[in-house]
């Protein structure tokens, strides 16, 4: 009980600006209600006779009947027919809708998108948070590294075939220009259509704005400088989003301080972007209750408290608790998650919301 009291006292002091450590920079944000959402497919646990009705007891907004696509929040995975290179075996891939944005058919995509939306969530009066989760490629050409590098290579090959006598720099520059022009078109028009057909909902793309902190090439809390500059140039996207949805999943391999730094940097960047926009979209951080690199292990009570605390003191408007279908695909997993909710996650959530609000 003493630990809970101390945690609440410290949190309230930070929220009210009475105390802030040397590494803390309180973000200037208008006073808002702090909300926590449940975005976990726990409906899958119903088949085992386990229900998560207690979620709302902890001041967590929970879809009616535990629906995954519900009245409070709905996430749409890879909706429509975005251009993509879908991986097959032996390094091969299947080309979907042109493979890359500059080769794609936007009309077909938008038609498939609205069909998908109407099928998965037909209620056009939806007034919750609508999340578009598209992670095949990023609209900034440079940011397509790792598994996404295939999109850069594919784009470069297209230009090289057209202009075999151009030098490497000219080819890459043209590939980048074409890719980014049409990537913007696909992402922007998709968002506009979602807003047009579900006008009461708050829409945003999962993960944006990106920060790329605590990564191999930028192993510090602050966001990559180039990424910040690129975020500044993405007002075309953020001006259309009602909510910003940075991802703050933490890894077990990081030290406790590094985990805090990861959350701090990403929330601060999203708040910075929000503060630059006239409509000041709310910032809801996507948060996972397990470690990203050790998905069978729940976050410790300390990590839950500290990550929630960082989201609050750096100006976030709330948290979206996310979970994978693989987290709840057996009786034992459902039982463990429910116990974790009742004993660790839930009590911390209610303490944080009451302290802030």
Curated annotation (Swiss-Prot):
Q: Show the catalytic activity.
A: Random hydrolysis of (1->4)-linkages between N-acetyl-beta-D-glucosamine and D-glucuronate residues in hyaluronate
| Gene Ontology MF terms | hyalurononglucosaminidase activity
**InterPro entries, A to Z:** Aldolase_TIM (IPR013785), Glycoside_hydrolase_SF (IPR017853), Hyaluronidase (IPR018155), Venom_Hyaluronidase (IPR001329)
| Glycosylation (residues) | 105, 125, 153, 351
Arranged from A to Z, the UniProt key words for this protein are: Allergen, Disulfide bond, Glycoprotein, Glycosidase, Hydrolase, Secreted, Signal
Q: Which residues form a coiled coil?
A: none
Q: Which Gene3D superfamilies match?
A: Aldolase class I
Which pairs of positions does the record mark as disulfide bonds?
45-334, 211-223
The family database entries (SUPFAM superfamilies) matched by this protein are listed as: (Trans)glycosidases
Which coarse location class describes where this protein primarily resides? secreted
| Pfam families, per database record | Glyco_hydro_56 (PF01630)
GO CC, alphabetical: extracellular region
Which N-terminal stretch is annotated as signal sequence?
Answer: 1-26
Q: What is its EC number?
A: 3.2.1.35
Tell me, what is an example of a GO biological process annotation in this record? Answer: carbohydrate metabolic process
The active-site annotation reads 135 (proton donor)
Q: Does the keyword Signal apply?
A: yes
Which top EC class is named for this enzyme in its record?
A: hydrolase
Similarity comment: family membership:
Belongs to the glycosyl hydrolase 56 family.
| Primary role | Hydrolyzes high molecular weight hyaluronic acid to produce small oligosaccharides.
Q: What is this protein called?
A: Hyaluronidase
């Amino acid at each position: 009980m003493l630990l809970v009291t101390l945690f609440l006292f410290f949190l309230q002091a930070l929220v009210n600006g009475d105390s802030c450590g040397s590494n803390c920079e309180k973000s200037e944000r208008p006073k808002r209600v702090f909300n926590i959402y449940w975005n976990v497919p726990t409906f899958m646990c119903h088949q085992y006779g386990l229900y998560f009705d207690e979620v709302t007891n902890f001041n967590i907004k929970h879809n009616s009947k535990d629906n995954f696509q519900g009245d409070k929040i709905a996430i749409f995975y890879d909706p429509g027919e975005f251009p993509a290179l879908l991986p097959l075996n032996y390094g091969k891939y299947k080309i979907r809708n042109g493979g890359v944005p500059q080769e794609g058919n936007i009309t077909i995509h938008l038609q498939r998108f609205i069909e998908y939306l109407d099928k998965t969530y037909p209620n056009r009066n939806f007034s919750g948070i609508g999340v578009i989760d598209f992670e095949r490629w990023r609209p900034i050409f440079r940011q397509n590294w790792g598994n996404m590098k295939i999109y850069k290579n594919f784009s470069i090959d297209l230009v090289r075939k057209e202009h075999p006598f151009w030098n490497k720099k000219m080819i890459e520059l043209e590939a980048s220009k074409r890719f980014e022009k049409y990537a913007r078109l696909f992402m922007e028009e998709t968002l506009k259509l979602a807003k047009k057909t579900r006008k009461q909902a708050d829409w945003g793309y999962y993960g944006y704005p990106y920060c790329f902190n605590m990564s191999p090439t930028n192993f510090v809390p602050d966001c990559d400088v180039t990424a910040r500059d690129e975020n500044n140039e993405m007002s075309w996207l953020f001006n259309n989003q009602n909510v910003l949805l940075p991802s703050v999943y933490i890894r077990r391999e990081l030290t406790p301080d590094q985990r805090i730094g990861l959350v701090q940097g990403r929330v601060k960047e999203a708040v910075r972007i929000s503060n630059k926009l006239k409509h000041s979209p709310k910032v809801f951080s996507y948060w996972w209750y397990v470690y990203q690199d050790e998905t069978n292990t729940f976050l410790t009570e300390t990590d839950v408290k500290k990550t929630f605390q960082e989201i609050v003191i750096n100006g976030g408007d709330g948290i979206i608790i996310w979970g994978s279908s693989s987290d709840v695909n057996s009786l034992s997993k459902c039982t463990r998650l429910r116990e974790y909710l009742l004993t660790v996650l839930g009590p911390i959530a209610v303490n944080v919301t009451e302290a802030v609000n």
